[in-house]
């Protein structure tokens, strides 16, 4: 009888201790989460009123929040450590307020996350462009070397197929030509475009010939900015990040972007297109030839657009080195290959 009582008491005590420990852990977790949320609200609230990275850095120093700058081509990105939890903070570039519709970005970003294609984004303020995403531990952006490997490209195709055939629909259409008009309207010195090269009149004329390229195409959700840095690999799972330019488009536009931005070899580019066409059941000789022609047109138009984009940014004091020249050279090279 005594043995039975001891066993019962031990069981009761274990149950009580487990309950107490669970309660303590819940209380601790709630306290930590509250602390994290308070810090996030403070940081985001400050950044909304200030687009100067140096002032944000000073604010983080003042509040003893560990951080490190991780760069970014169009925005300043900062890695934060808030109570042991890592986040990536985007300090938006003020010029981008005129270039990017943040409401579309916020909507599309959320849709992509729900589909498992994007990282968690606790904050994306549509008015200011301030964004806070969860940092993925043990993850790396894809390199140009990786993207020239068939195993990596196959994984990219799987993500593209999921994106382009998803059930959700983005609210906006991404058109290279509409974007061009917007950027050109913001360019104060128009001659910076037309006097960049003696062949600009020809380039411009050919560019506008393709304005109806998507006329009979079923537009699908697209990322539209799949540079290697926007593809994040964690173990065997691939994420597409930074949905600033996302919108409905020809799915081949995403493939064209990867070919251009990752500088794929001809073999890798052909493999990417063939694998994608196979997965979408569109791989036969005629379809492939048509797709190949459309890819070159998209690549040409992308280079023209990003050349202009760079000139707009440079007018506001940003330094992109020879990036604009490389874009223009690529456009002229493709111009000679166009059908």
Curated annotation (Swiss-Prot):
Sequence repeats: 4-7, 8-11, 12-15, 16-19, 20-23, 24-27, 28-31, 32-35, 36-39
Keyword Hydrolase: no
Tagged with keyword Flavoprotein: no
Classification via Pfam families: Choline_kinase (PF01633)
Keywords tagged on the record: Repeat
Record PANTHER family: CELL CYCLE REGULATOR CCRZ, PHOSPHOTRANSFERASE YTMP-RELATED
Family note: Belongs to the peptidase S49 family.
Note: There is spontaneous, high frequency switching between three discrete levels of expression (++++, +, -) of oligosaccharide epitopes.
Chain's role: Mediates phase variation of the LOS 6A2 and 12D9 epitopes. Phase variation of H.influenza LOS epitopes expressed by LicA is determined by a translational switch.
Protein name: Protein LicA
UniProt lineage: Bacteria, Pseudomonadati, Pseudomonadota, Gammaproteobacteria, Pasteurellales
